[in-house]
């Protein structure tokens, strides 16, 4: 099969209505997103000179490939996505869509020798970050993976944290 980098931004809406004979009718159909925007940034990973210069590879597996007419994600066919990276100063950025399913996906990073250097379950990340609301219509899951001298830290990028302090 073909390599999948992302799925399209998908929206679904339905509404029953009857158009009177020989009349016009205007109705609004509410749409809801079937997808989640993913933003994964990897910082601090420096390959040794002995390795090739090709970038890190992100693999996201156990992803559903379609939704039904009720906008429900199905687990009938699972796929692996290979998001494309945008190499920035000292970081790799992956932007892609997945269907609204968060139980099974696993993110894995591979170095240029195709050796797995990091993996994480998306469900575990979301459990640690309840501030990410995957139930809202337009959802983004921002993930920052930082390689440091003491190990790997996974967090939410600073730009994604909404520090709301309502004043009364």
Located regions from the model:
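Short, low-hydrophobicity acidic/polar segments
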Residues: 1-34
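Generic detection of short hydrophobic beta-strand segments and adjacent strand-loop junctions
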Residues: 15-19, 27-29, 79-84, 96, ...
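Residues at beta-strand starts and edge strands
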Residues: 23-25, 34-36, 54, 103-105, ...
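Intrinsic-disorder/low-complexity, polar/charged segments enriched in Ser/Thr/Lys/Arg/Asp/Glu/Gln
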Residues: 24-26, 37, 89-93
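Tryptophan-paired
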Residues: 51-130
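Hydrophilic extracytoplasmic domains
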Residues: 105-168
